[in-house]
């Protein structure tokens, strides 16, 4: 049963009992990707696989090319080297027709919502259906009303973007991203402009959508609360390279200085106002810290916080079981701290110490 069936039958949107009828999201395989603008290198040799049907987060300081990476994944920008394999097609080498077909797999939530100011929320949400399908207006109405209800905007369809809050605009943008039933959803800094409470609601909404449609979701953000509690997998860009990408426990337990600094929001570390610092600046800041000067941020956060679950009444996230099977297979290749955190999560305990792993 599709969303629209549920809306049409009852007159209001209801959570789906299962994801039957929705294909699982597809994986994205990125190999050796390099992108420059003129003589300025943005990032180089980026290699990762975004697992199908799971939620992943890409972190990084401002200016590291996270949004450029998203635009490359959907073919809006063309890297000069590497490949991006989606559903068996390399979108860098494919024809324009093939790229058009691949783009139908995507839904994109842009950083500012990218709503048309002259259209109300109904017409904004209906726009992709009118542009890319031959559906009747009655069918379009069922889909639009159901997607707006899904993101908590039922009854607001006649409002214009200028009449609603930033959080509502983000949700409207998400509704529009969902109308074509995408298998991949890209979210470009969905928390931008939102307060912590609205960000928490949006995080829950993203997880519920993953439970509903089993789509592959990639979130670009520098919001640490999202990074710690939402994704199945995490990665980080810094100094034109991918620092790491893998199960969330790998990054959250990492001892890499740039990762620890970023996750704790402190001045001490490699990241500076212009992305990176020289050794002299780092030594000076460390001396100030040793002398008792506060380095900003929070106290060092240890451990891996629980991941957000789907709201009760939603379907079970199929991604959870797939991820568990996948990380069990790769467990022996991961750092010891990550292994301990994963075993704790898999067994529902907190009994594993790092020194016990591998014994």
UniProtKB/Swiss-Prot annotation:
The keyword ATP-binding applies. It comes from the Bacteria. PROSITE patterns: ABC_TRANSPORTER_1, ABC_TRANSPORTER_2. The modification N6-acetyllysine is found at residue 337. InterPro entries: AAA+_ATPase, ABC_transporter-like_ATP-bd, ABC_transporter-like_CS, P-loop_NTPase. Residues 28-264 form the ABC transporter domain. ATP binds at residues 60-67. Keywords: Acetylation, ATP-binding, Nucleotide-binding, Transport. One of its GO terms (cellular component) is plasma membrane. GO terms for molecular function: ATP binding; ATP hydrolysis activity. One of its GO terms (biological process) is cholesterol import. Pfam families: ABC_tran. Belongs to the ABC transporter superfamily. Not known, could be involved in the transport of ribonucleotides. This is Probable ribonucleotide transport ATP-binding protein mkl. It comes from Mycobacterium tuberculosis (strain ATCC 25618 / H37Rv).
């Amino acid at each position: 049963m599709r969303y629209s069936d549920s809306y049409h039958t009852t007159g209001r949107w209801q959570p789906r009992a299962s994801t039957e009828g929705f294909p699982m999201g597809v994986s994205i395989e990125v190999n050796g990707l390099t992108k420059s603008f003129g003589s300025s290198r943005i990032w180089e040799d980026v290699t990762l696989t975004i697992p199908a049907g799971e939620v992943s987060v890409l972190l990084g300081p401002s200016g590291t090319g996270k949004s450029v990476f998203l635009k490359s994944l959907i073919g809006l920008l063309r890297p000069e080297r590497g490949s991006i394999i989606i559903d068996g097609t390399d979108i860098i080498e494919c024809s324009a027709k093939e790229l058009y077909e691949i783009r139908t797999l995507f839904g994109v939530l842009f950083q500012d919502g990218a709503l048309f100011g002259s259209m109300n929320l109904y017409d904004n949400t209906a726009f992709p259906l009118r542009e890319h399908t031959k559906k009747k207006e009655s069918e379009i109405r069922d889909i639009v009303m159901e997607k707006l209800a899904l993101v908590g905007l039922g009854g607001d369809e006649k409002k214009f973007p200028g009449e609603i809050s930033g959080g509502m605009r983000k949700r409207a943008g998400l509704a529009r991203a969902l109308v074509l039933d995408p298998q991949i959803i890209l979210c470009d800094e969905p928390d931008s402009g939102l307060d912590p409470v609205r960000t928490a609601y949006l995080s829950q909404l993203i997880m519920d959508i993953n439970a509903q449609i089993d789509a592959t979701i990639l979130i670009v953000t520098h919001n640490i609360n999202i990074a710690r509690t939402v994704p199945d997998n995490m990665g980080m860009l810094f100094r034109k390279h991918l620092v790491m990408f893998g199960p969330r426990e790998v990054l959250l337990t990492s001892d890499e200085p740039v990762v620890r600094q970023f996750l704790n929001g402190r001045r001490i570390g490699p990241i500076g106002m212009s992305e990176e610092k020289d050794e002299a600046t780092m030594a000076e800041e460390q001396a100030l810290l040793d002398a008792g000067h506060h380095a900003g941020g929070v106290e060092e956060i240890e451990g891996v916080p629980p991941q957000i679950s789907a709201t009760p009444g939603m379907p079970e996230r199929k991604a959870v079981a797939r991820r568990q099977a996948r990380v069990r297979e790769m467990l022996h290749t991961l750092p010891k701290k990550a292994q301990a955190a994963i075993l704790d999560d898999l067994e529902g305990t907190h009994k594993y110490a790092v020194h016990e792993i591998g014994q």
